[in-house]
C-alpha cells in the first residue's frame, strides 16, 4: 500500500517538467525549443529562463527570462550577441542550450556549431531565482554571470545598474513591441553620474540627443529598483532621486513589478495583479504607475533623426492610462509599413516635379490646413512679415516645399521640405500647417483659393505663362464656371430660401442632399440617436463606396426661429474644420424640409459616457477635456470670425470611436465680426451651464463659453452632473459650490474619492479644478480666454490661486 502511494510521487520527481523548478540547475542540464524541457523555472514558478517563441514568427526563438504566471508571458530579458554586436540571439528550432559538464552555458545547433555563450567558464551550477535573475555560480557560490548585470530593456525589483562602463549596462528599448531588435531609445547610467534618456541611431546605437535626465554628477551613482517597488537614482552622497513610484497600491506580495524602456522612448514602471481580478486599477493587465518623461511627444525635438515617430509622421497620445505614443500620417500620406510605423510615412501621390511651370503647379496642387500639429526644425526658408495667402502660394509653386507653417500673430511663414521630423500633436500649437497635396475640387480640407487676392495673383501668373498653357487654363476655368453655374441654378431652384451667402462664406464645399436621398439613407428615419427642442437626430448610411455612417438632424416645425437656427448651423460649422468639431457633410433645404447631415460619432454624447455606472479612466477624461478646450480655442481665436457656441453641455460634445471629443450643435451660435468683442442676444443655452451675464442687460462675449467649459471641466473631474439632488451630503448638491469648498479647504481629493487613477495624479486634478474655478468667475473680465485655459490645462504656464467665485450659480432659477 505504501509503495502504491509513493509511486505517483516518484513519477512526479522524475518528470522533466517538474525537474525544471528545482532551485539549482546542475551541470549537464539541457533545454530545447521544442523539446519536453524548454525552460527552467524559479522555485515559485513566477519566472522562467529558456526558449521563448516570438509572436508572429515561427522561424526562431529567443533566449529569454519572462514572467511565467501571467497570460502574456512578458519578457524582461533576452540574450544579445556581444557588446560590439548588440543584436538579439536568434535561435533556430533545432538548437539546444546546455550547461555543459566542463562548466559553460552554450547554445549549439544540430551540427554542434556554437551560436552563443555568455563568455564565462568554471560554472558549477545555475539558478533561476524568484527575483527574475538567472545566475551562473561557481562551486563556492560566487556569481560568475547573471542577467541582472546584462539588462535588455527592463529592470526588476532588487536590480541595480551602476555607472556605465560598457554599453550593455544601459537599457536599450526594443524596435517595436514584437520586434526585439535594438530600438531607437537608450537609458544610460553615465560615468559622470547622470541618468539620461537618449534618441539613438538604428542599428548603430550612436547617441543623437538627450531628451530627459536627472542633471546629476558624481562617480558611483546607480539606478536602483528597490525590493519595496521604488525606482530611484542613488547618488554617492546618499541622495535619492525618485524616478517612479509604487503609488501605494499594494504590497510586493500582491503585484508583479517591472520598469521598462518602451519602444516609444518612455521609461515606465508597471504593476500586474498576482491574483485574478485583484487589480485596484482594473483587469489582468500591466498598468503604468508612472513614466519619464511625462509627455514624450513634446520631449523630443532633435536636430538629427526623425524624433519620436518616423519621418513625415507625427506623435500623439492614445488616451489610455499608460499614455502610449501613437504615430500618425498627415492627410495624403501613408505609412511605409503599417506594421512598423516607426519607419515613417511617404507621400501617397506623385510628388511635385521641379519641371512644372508656376501656373501648372498652382493648377495641380493645393494646400490643406492642419491644426494642432507641428514639425519643428524641418524648415529651410522663413518669410516675415507676410500674409497667409502669399505664404501658401510660395509653397505651392516651389517643388522643394512639402508644407508651409503660418503664424497669424507674428505674420511669419516657414517653408518645410521632406523628410519632416519631430512631428507632434500639441495643445499649445497656435500655428497653422498648410500641407501641399494634389488639387481636388471636392476636397474638404482645401484652403479657399477664391479670395480676391489669390485670384488677382493667379491672373498675373497665368498671363505670365506661355500662350498655350494660358489658353488651356482659361478653357478649364470656363468649363468649371459653367459647371458651378449649372450646379448653382439646380440648387436654387430646389430651395425656398437662398443659401448662397452661407456657402460663399464657407471654405468647405457642402454636399446638397435631396429629401429622398436622406429618407433612403436613414431607412425611412427609423433609428433615433437623440432628440432636442428643434428636431430629432437619426442614424443613416450613405450609398458611397465606404458605406459612410451619418447622423441626420431634422428641423421640425419650420418657423422663423428654427429657420434661423438652420441657417446659423450651416453658416457656422460649414466654414470650420477642426479635429475637435463635428464635421457637417451637407444639408437638405428642399421646400419645407430642413435637414443637416453630420459625420457619425460612434460613442455618442459625453453625458452617456460620463454619467454611466462605470467611471471612464482618468486619462480618458483628461484627453476629452483637452480636446474640448482645443475646439473652443479654434472657434474663439482661429476662425476668420469668432464663433460663440452659446449652448455647450455634455449632450453637445460627441465622441468618436477613439473617444476624441468633438463639439456639436451650433444652432444657437453667434458670429462676431472682426471688430466685435460682444454681441446682444436673448438668453440662450441650458440651465446649469449658462454664464451669469445672460441674466443681465449686458452684451455677451466668448467668455460665456469659457464659463460653460468650467462647469463641464468639473463634471469631467468628478464624473457627476453639475446638479445632483440625490446625494447624502447636501453640500455636494451643486458641483461648482462643492468644488470651490474643497479647493478652499485643501481637500481636492474628496472630488475624486474612490478614483485611484485620479488620486495618483492628484496634482493634475488640482490644476484642472483651479482652471475651472477661474472659468467660473462671475465677472467675465476675470475669466481667462481659451488660449490661456489650454495653456493652464497643459501645465505650460503657472496658475495663480483664483478668487472665491461669487455665489451666483446659474443652475438655480
UniProtKB/Swiss-Prot annotation:
Which intervals lie on the Extracellular side per UniProt? 20-466
Q: Which cysteines are joined by disulfide bonds?
A: 297-315, 309-327, 329-345, 391-413, 395-401
The entry's keywords: ATP-binding, Disulfide bond, EGF-like domain, Glycoprotein, Kinase, Lectin, Membrane, Nucleotide-binding, Plant defense, Receptor, Serine/threonine-protein kinase, Signal, Transferase, Transmembrane, Transmembrane helix
Bulb-type lectin domain: residues covered: 22-149
Concerning InterPro entries, the annotation shows:
Bulb-type_lectin_dom, Bulb-type_lectin_dom_sf, G-type_lectin_kinases/EP1-like, Kinase-like_dom_sf, Prot_kinase_dom, Protein_kinase_ATP_BS, Ser/Thr_kinase_AS, SRK-like_kinase
Q: Which residues are glycosylated?
A: 24, 57, 164, 168, 219, 242, 407, 441
Question: Where exactly are the transmembrane stretches of this chain?
Answer: 467-487
What EC designation does it have?
A: 2.7.11.1
List the ranges whose topology is Cytoplasmic: 488-813
Record's keyword annotation contains Glycoprotein: yes
| UniProt note on tissues of expression | Expressed in plumules, radicles and panicles.
Class of enzymatic activity (EC top level): transferase
Q: Where in the cell is it found?
A: Membrane
Domain of life of the native organism: Eukaryota
The reactions it catalyses are: L-seryl-[protein] + ATP = O-phospho-L-seryl-[protein] + ADP + H(+); L-threonyl-[protein] + ATP = O-phospho-L-threonyl-[protein] + ADP + H(+)
The family database entries (Gene3D superfamilies) matched by this protein are listed as: Bulb-type lectin domain, Phosphorylase Kinase, domain 1, Transferase(Phosphotransferase) domain 1
What are the residue boundaries of the PAN domain, all occurrences included? 354-433
UniProt keyword annotation of rRNA-binding present: no
Any idea what job this protein has?
Answer: Involved in innate immunity. Required for the expression of defense-related genes PR1A, LOX2 and CHS1 upon biotic stresses. Required for basal resistance to the fungal blast (M.grisea), bacterial blight (O.oryzae pv. oryzae, Xoo) and the herbivorous insect brown planthopper (N.lugens, BPH). May be involved in several defense signaling pathways. Involved in the promotion of seed germination. Required for the expression of alpha-amylase genes during seed germination. Involved in resistance against the brown planthopper (BPH).
- Subunit structure, interactors included: Interacts (via kinase domain) with ADF4.
* Other known facts: Seeds silencing LECRK1 show decreased germination rates due to decreased alpha-amylase activity during seed germination. Plants silencing LECRK1 have increased susceptibility to infection by the fungal blast (M.grisea), bacterial blight (X.oryzae pv. oryzae, Xoo) and the herbivorous insect brown planthopper (N.lugens, BPH). Plants silencing LECRK1 display reduced induction of the defense-related genes PR1A, LOX2 and CHS1 after exposure to biotic stresses.
Name of the protein this chain belongs to: G-type lectin S-receptor-like serine/threonine-protein kinase LECRK1
